[in-house]
Structure formats: structure tokens, C-alpha cells
């Protein structure tokens, strides 16, 4: 199944990332976009469509100059001329790079790549700035059982705010207070599944949630998949710090692919840009 990833937004609220696409903000050695792609690839979905916008060159150049050595163990021999990787990240990925406009919204970006989804009855999509350990096949099974046009992940917000209840008739008297993530509030966590019919609901210049989703709701064609496992978005510098802490401590729940290895394979050192630049 193809995976549409929205990569055109800015990281304005993330320190030192104001001028790059937010999905290119790094978690460990790789951008969060890579972590999202690894998640989907783990479940067999390796055909990606990247909806590019602001600083599209950053995304393109990252993959054009991709080095497997950064995130994989390897053996260097033959005086630096022979490289054997124990694992490979993107060898079997197919990536379509689509410029979808500098200031386009999500609805416009999705509509712009409709032509690359020809023949697909359904597809996956993601904001590319959130991570989860969700067993994706479970969400897909739920989607197929419900037989609706669209589905997205419904998660509890990871916020430090508290929900406050005020007593009726006395708006100054607090009747309850609790952490927002302990209540009944759920938010749109992304991780969309769409039938191709979604394009019938998108009008020109409409944001995905404001227009198309409202029409889907009116026709009872939008479902949410409730998930209480790990989910974390990256909207602020604090969010990034949290993900970096999990990654650095070896407890990154979203790395569902960690148990799988692809075996050792030989690589042309000249094609490994990071290695060739450091070995001389």
C-alpha cells in the first residue's frame, strides 16, 4: 500500500529548526520523517510519496546523499575499499518526490498527488511529525471492518495542562481538576487510512480537516481508531527533547523494527557519501 507523507510544513516552534521542514528535524541520527518511514516499512508499506513544500531541497538532498552507515553497523576492510553492512534501511524503498507548493495546506498537498495514486483503492497518509508503536495491521483490520472512506488515530493529548470543571451557577467555584490526558479528550493523531473516494470530498484550497472531514462526518464516513499505547507528536522544542530522551535512553517505543535484521551485504564504498568523505 502506498504511503503519502506531508513534508511541507515549517518547524517554527522548534529551536534551531525554524528554516527546515519540520519532518526533517532530527531524532538521534535521523530526521523524524525517516523514523515514520521506517515504521511503515516495518509493516511492509515501502512505496512512499513525499508531499514537499518549504525547503523541498532539504528533503531531496537528504535522500540523494543518503548513507546507510549512519544508522547501521558495518565492517570496513580492504584498506577502506570494501564495506559490508549488517542491515539496510532504504534499499527496498521506492520514494516519489512531489513538489506540492510552498504555502499549500494539507488538503491541497493531498489533492496534488492524486495522480501518483492511480490504481490504488486505498492508501495510507501521515503528518510526518508524530510517532507511535501502534500495531498498524490492527488499525487496517478495523478500517476494513467498518468500510468507511477515512480513518485516523484518536489518541490522548500529551500535554501538561489540566482540565478544569466549574460548578454550574457559580462559575468561580472549581468542582474538578485533572490532567488533560486522564480525561475523555482525544485528538487527531494522524496515521490516516483513506479510500480513493477521499478525493471526491476535497474542494479547491480546502484544508483537509475543515472541509472534507466535515463532509465525511455528515455522511458518517469518517471513523477514529482509539489507541492508548505510545503516541507522541513533535510540535515544540519540548516535544523534541522528550523524543530525544527516549531515543538516547534506548527506550524508543516507536522503533518497532528493531528486532528485524536484513543480513549482511556488501556495498560500494564510493556510493556511501558519509563514509567516502571521511575515509579519503
Where do the model's predicted regions map?
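N-terminal glycine-rich phosphate-binding loop and ensuing alpha1 helix
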Residues: 1-66, 97
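Conserved beta-loop-beta/alpha segment of the NTase-like Rossmann-fold superfamily
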Residues: 59-168
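Short beta->alpha linker loops
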Residues: 28, 54-55, 101, 156, ...
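Well-ordered alpha-helical segments embedded in enzymatic catalytic cores
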Residues: 32-36, 108-112, 212
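Structural beta-sheet core signal
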Residues: 3-5, 50, 125, 150-153, ...
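Catalytic-core segments of class I nucleotidyltransferases/pyrophosphorylases
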Residues: 121-124, 131-144, 156-160, 169-269
Amino acid at each position: 500500500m502506498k504511503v503519502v507523507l506531508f513534508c511541507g510544513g515549517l518547524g517554527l516552534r522548534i529551536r534551531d529548526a525554524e528554516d527546515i521542514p519540520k519532518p526533517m528535524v532530527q531524532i538521534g541520527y535521523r530526521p523524524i520523517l525517516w523514523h515514520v518511514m521506517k515504521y511503515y516499512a516495518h509493516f511492509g508499506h515501502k512505496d512512499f510519496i513525499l508531499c514537499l513544500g518549504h525547503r523541498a531541497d532539504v528533503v531531496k538532498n537528504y535522500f540523494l546523499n543518503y548513507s546507510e552507515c549512519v544508522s547501521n553497523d558495518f565492517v570496513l576492510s580492504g584498506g577502506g575499499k570494501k564495506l559490508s553492512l549488517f542491515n539496510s534501511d532504504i534499499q527496498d524503498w521506492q520514494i516519489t518526490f512531489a513538489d506540492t507548493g510552498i504555502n499549500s495546506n494539507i488538503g491541497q498537498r493531498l489533492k496534488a498527488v492524486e495522480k501518483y495514486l492511480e490504481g490504488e483503492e486505498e492508501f495510507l497518509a501521515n503528518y510526518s511529525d508524530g510517532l507511535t508503536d501502534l500495531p498498524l495491521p490492527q488499525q487496517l483490520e478495523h478500517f476494513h471492518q467498518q468500510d468507511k472512506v477515512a480513518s485516523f488515530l484518536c489518541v490522548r493529548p500529551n500535554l501538561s495542562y489540566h482540565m478544569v470543571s466549574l460548578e454550574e451557577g457559580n462559575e468561580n467555584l472549581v468542582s474538578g481538576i485533572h490532567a488533560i490526558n486522564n480525561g475523555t479528550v482525544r485528538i487527531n493523531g494522524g496515521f490516516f487510512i483513506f479510500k480513493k473516494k477521499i478525493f471526491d470530498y476535497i474542494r479547491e484550497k480546502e484544508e483537509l480537516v475543515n472541509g472534507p472531514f466535515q463532509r465525511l462526518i455528515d455522511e458518517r464516513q469518517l471513523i477514529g481508531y482509539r489507541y492508548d499505547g505510545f503516541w507522541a507528536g513533535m510540535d515544540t522544542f519540548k516535544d523534541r527533547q522528550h523524543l530525544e530522551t527516549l531515543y538516547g535512553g534506548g527506550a524508543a517505543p516507536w522503533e518497532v523494527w528493531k528486532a528485524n535484521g536484513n543480513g549482511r551485504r556488501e556495498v560500494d564504498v564510493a556510493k556511501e557519501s558519509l563514509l567516502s568523505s571521511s575515509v579519503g
